[in-house]
Amino acid sequence: MREILHIQGGQCGNQIGAKFWEVVCDEHGIDPTGRYTGNSDLQLERVNVYYNEASCGRFVPRAVLMDLEPGTMDSVRTGPYGQIFRPDNFVFGQSGAGNNWAKGHYTEGAELIDSVLDVVRKEAENCDCLQGFQVCHSLGGGTGSGMGTLLISKIREEYPDRMMLTFSVFPSPKVSDTVVEPYNATLSVHQLVENADECMVLDNEALYDICFRTLKLTTPSFGDLNHLISATMSGVTCCLRFPGQLNSDLRKLAVNLIPFPRLHFFMVGFAPLTSRGSQQYRALTVPELTQQMWDAKNMMCAADPRHGRYLTASAMFRGKMSTKEVDEQMINVQNKNSSYFVEWIPNNVKSSVCDIPPRGLSMASTFIGNSTSIQEMFRRVSEQFTAMFRRKAFLHWYTGEGMDEMEFTEAESNMNDLVSEYQQYQDATADEEGEYEDEEQQEADDM
């Protein structure tokens, strides 16, 4: 019931995905061979959100793994939980996308996409009532961005009424892996605006900062970063998998978070984040979780919520706690920081409570915010895009795969439109509406 089909693509997506399955397996008491070794009926009650039960009693993730080169897939397969995935669900090419969006979207990726869709269909047919898809990918490379967005648009055609949730790793402001990141990211956002329902925006630099500043790790690895991401991913769907007093699902989340269809890019946060040594010295309380969760330093993308305003936000608490206290804390946050919330959406923070905390914690919370300050991410990528595109730098790699310059121009203006939409709602006030009506009335009279 209410299954979610997980898809991971490209190197980044596969590495995040692998970590995510470690976390979810741990929560449901499933060992690396797919056997249940847990100690609570609650772990099994709705295990089928993310798992198929095979005939021999093994639990198999509803996961599709794709890449245009075999390398990362091999390391997932040999990793700690590599044996749990269905072998047919690994779909990979040999050529690689070479960090080129066009290769992922139009040439190499297009050749592989049908075999990926076959696996997706097979998994979807195994579902009793498919709720939606969650896609892990990065926007800076070739496969996750190009082929990832191709797959999203194909799934959109075939399953138009199912939720499409993405965990998208944006290029970082200061750390760059590839020169052509701005191109790949802009072309991807162009697709995500149209075809995804909810995008959780992540970026490595913000994750590094959390590891340095809050977790006090001196040399964070991608594994540490991905662990942060997977804690958030597990938090987003915990209400579907464990009983709670205030449930939420992907669709409820969307209804509460998206005031305008194009503005579906969210910043995420997680609490408690404490360094490994100091965990046992703190008692967790709802106020403390709330305070940390709303802290700008805890956001997993390089945009500062204090530079914009929240259109909406959602908080998911996990653990044994009083819902009354949760509600009070949420109202408290809105009252104390009212200037950071748009006043034309009253009560714009939704909260949900799930009774089962993550492993090793007594309580935890996941934060998802729809803030206008996310435009900083798009603005930054857009500036880098324009700088290169003006000189047509690196463009031949894309046109050589059959792309047209026109597509770049469209993607660029779509991204800039998105930025101005966020800006427009950041500046909007509740009483402006009245002024417009007066003007219209005036015009009508003049006519």
Swiss-Prot record:
Any one Gene Ontology BP term: microtubule cytoskeleton organization
Record carries keyword Cell wall biogenesis/degradation: no
Inducing or repressing factors: Down-regulated by abscisic acid (ABA).
Subcellular location: Cytoplasm, Cytoskeleton
Tissue expression pattern: Expressed in roots and leaf sheaths.
Annotated residues for binding of GTP: 11, 69, 138, 142-144, 204, 226
Residue spans of biased composition, Acidic residues class: 429-447
Region Disordered, residue ranges: 423-447
UniProt keyword list: Cytoplasm, Cytoskeleton, GTP-binding, Magnesium, Metal-binding, Microtubule, Nucleotide-binding
Binding positions (Mg(2+)): 69
Required co-factors: Mg(2+)
GO cellular component term, pick one: cytoplasm
Main location: cytoplasm
Pfam families, per database record: Tubulin (PF00091), Tubulin_C (PF03953)
A GO molecular function held by the record: structural constituent of cytoskeleton
Known function: Tubulin is the major constituent of microtubules, a cylinder consisting of laterally associated linear protofilaments composed of alpha- and beta-tubulin heterodimers. Microtubules grow by the addition of GTP-tubulin dimers to the microtubule end, where a stabilizing cap forms. Below the cap, tubulin dimers are in GDP-bound state, owing to GTPase activity of alpha-tubulin.
Subunit structure as annotated in this protein's UniProt entry: Dimer of alpha and beta chains. A typical microtubule is a hollow water-filled tube with an outer diameter of 25 nm and an inner diameter of 15 nM. Alpha-beta heterodimers associate head-to-tail to form protofilaments running lengthwise along the microtubule wall with the beta-tubulin subunit facing the microtubule plus end conferring a structural polarity. Microtubules usually have 13 protofilaments but different protofilament numbers can be found in some organisms and specialized cells.
Similarity section: Belongs to the tubulin family.
Protein name: Tubulin beta-4 chain
Native source organism of the sequence: Oryza sativa subsp. japonica (Rice)
Gene (UniProt): TUBB4
